[in-house]
Amino acid sequence: MPVVVIVHRLKNFDEWLKLFKADPPPKIGRWRLLRGSDDRNRVHVVGEVAASEVKAVKDFIGSQHMQDVFKRVNAMSTAPLEVIWLEELAP
């Protein structure tokens, strides 16, 4: 199952959370919000999607609306956000 991880290194988690709640992930797949236990301003938004949903999620992330949101996020971050696509390997 493909996984996308969006890594945020924030200046202020509470300010970012307001923006996140206003523009949540798509309703495609299963999404989790993880916060660093050692750095409370590091956040990972993790989405698990079916292979058939990857294109829709990539289209959502690449949409003009989300690019505008990401510009706002980067302005409240200590580093640019990072989008990482992963695929599961059998052990």
Question: Where in this protein do the model-derived segments appear?
Answer:
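Short S/T/G/P-rich N-terminal loop/turn motif that feeds into the first structured element of a domain
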Residues: 1-91
